[in-house]
A protein has these predicted regions:
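C-terminal intramolecular chaperone/autoprocessing and neck/assembly modules of extracellular spikes
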Residues: 2-86
Length: 86
């Protein structure tokens, strides 16, 4: 019997501003959302993406709250790519 539950993939990336540092606006993404370069507080590397708090104002359905209480963005709903840039 086929499952009615959608396939479970990895959780969306944590995009909560409370977990980011060295935040610099680098442009504007789809839906007129600010695009940022940033680092996470607990790891090395620089990433490019959006802030969940910004997305909530434009497309709240694209933001979920993880079990940890932090906001995550469903980038596929926005047509924006989350990526590591350094």
């Amino acid at each position: 019997m086929k499952s009615l539950r959608p396939p479970m993939g990895p959780p969306p990336p944590v995009s909560d501003v409370r977990l980011k540092t060295n935040i610099q606006r680098i442009g504007t993404a789809a839906h007129n959302l600010p695009l940022y370069a940033f680092s996470y507080l607990d790891e090395e590397g620089v990433y490019e993406g959006v802030m969940a708090q910004d997305v909530m104002n434009v497309m709240p359905a694209a933001v979920v709250v993880g079990e940890d209480g932090y906001y995550r963005v469903k980038y596929d709903m926005l047509g924006i790519e989350f990526r590591r840039i350094a």
